[in-house]
Amino acid sequence: KTRGVNVTIPHKQAVIPLMTRLEGRAQIYQSVNTIAVTPDGAVGYNTDADGFRHALQEGGAPLSGRVALLGCGGVGRTFACEAALAGCRIVNAVREADREMAAALRTFVQQLVPEVDYTIVSLDALQGEFDLLINATPVGMYPHTDASPVAAGVLAHTKAVFDAVYNPRETQLLQMAKAQGAAAIGGMAMLVWQAADAQTIWFGREFDPQAVAGVVEEALAEMERVFHG
């Protein structure tokens, strides 16, 4: 018997009309990545946000205070909304070509959290003190591993960095963060945690953080073997 399935781009919105109902973050974001088959029909969930929060928690980076969000694409919506729901002050740094998209994201977040403090700036103008910097761009992803979305100086007063990129294990951005003494968390942790949360929905099984950390390491080792020889 099928307990459920995972859904990915480009089907996260397309499956919604097939759902009996949406739960939690799936309802908020109108985006489904996990479907549970129940006696009452198909129920849509979104575990991307859960994976993100778990990754931050296990990496020692609280989602609080002043947050710099780089980019405003699909995964950026999840990060922006989670930061707003946590009461963070958001500085969204984007390319000039993405200003309109960033404004649309801000409007979406403001509808969810009307009182949110949300500023949009140019990526090359980002500066200041941040409790957390989140990279929601693909910059630094394999094979362009020598690239970073921001210069090292931007991280001088940043306490923690989360990079959604998971290949390579340690992006240029994360290397710079470590050099500045900041906590550095890669995207593989979010990927594995969202899968673990889907298993919890289907089977009711809770996962020990140490067990998940072990799976993260196994996934990173296999990725390095395949891509980096």
Regions found by a protein language model. Name each.
Residues 112-185:
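Rossmann-like adenosine-cofactor binding region
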Residues 44-49, 56, 60, 65-84:
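Glycine-rich adenosine-cofactor-binding loop
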Residues 85-90, 180-183:
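Conserved S-adenosyl-L-methionine
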Residues 14, 97-104, 168-172:
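Short, charged/polar "capping" segments at the starts of alpha-helices
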Residues 88-112:
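NAD(P)-binding Rossmann-fold cofactor-contacting core
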Residues 160, 164-229:
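Adenosine-phosphate binding glycine-rich loop
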Residues 1-60, 170:
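Phosphate/diphosphate ligand-binding glycine-rich loop within oxidoreductases
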